[in-house]
């Protein structure tokens, strides 16, 4: 048993870089800590992103750690997923397309005792990936010039969680995740003079290295009904985070000729320490389930992005509090029927008011999702497929509308590890 757990932990350590691949590419990742990776895993995402009141014994619902108590006392659960994001960016004057993808999550869970369960894994938190340019016509002082803004990086997390379901009140479950956040944030501003060979171009670069611990608390209450149905109420709370950063600042001049840059002089170079302040967030949810037949759920979430600060600076004119609304359902026609009847059919919708307000315009987001849980021979093991179409932003006020189509695939396996064999 323990050899298997050690193997999983070693496997996770080798795939950290792969798990941290960019999964979103959006011009709005310029703000805050980047474009928030809003999915949880393939199963949650296919049901509109609901998670607060979702309890299952065959996948890891890491957004609410209280859900880990649903894991069987003799089972080890492993879940790995990959997804691709296809985007179309539209402004009033141009259209561009892109595609990115990567490992969306690697998660596992197992029992410590009948009332105590543990989970862990690695997954991305946010992605920074933007490039923008602003050109100015020739004038009598400095001639034509161009500003270029670039950024890349993101934050990932390795988490370890524990959940407790007291035997004297087994309707209630409480959980806690300890999350190690790490990553890099690079951004630069470049000034060039395309029509003047005598003018020196200049660039300012910022590189932040991030490393910190954060905590996520969860609670779930399950009321079983006389007919075997169940109602679950769930909630979670993520503490505000102080992320210490190691900062590198560099300002230098260069010449640009035939696509080749030649550095001329370093104006300033320094290493400093700073911080990023991440806001608190909380969510509540409600679900109703008829075992082995259907489930419906609703979620509401709030994140206080108005309290975000980068190197001690807040951005109240740009960042605002974000409210999320999620609804989803799952239907299984007949778990004892033919193969098509055993498939879990999932669908959902999600809406965010958005954390950004640019030119007095809120950058909201709306998405609809569809998914399938394809059982394989081993009980509790599935291949899950997830599709989502959505849009973010608008073309009004010279902004950008982003249409996205996401496809996700995950493999969730439940294996019996924790039992004694009567015969060897």
Annotate each language-model stretch with its function.
Residues 16-20:
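Sec/Tat signal peptide C-region and signal peptidase I cleavage site
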Residues 5-14:
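Sec-dependent N-terminal signal peptides
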Residues 21-424:
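Subset of outer-membrane beta-barrel
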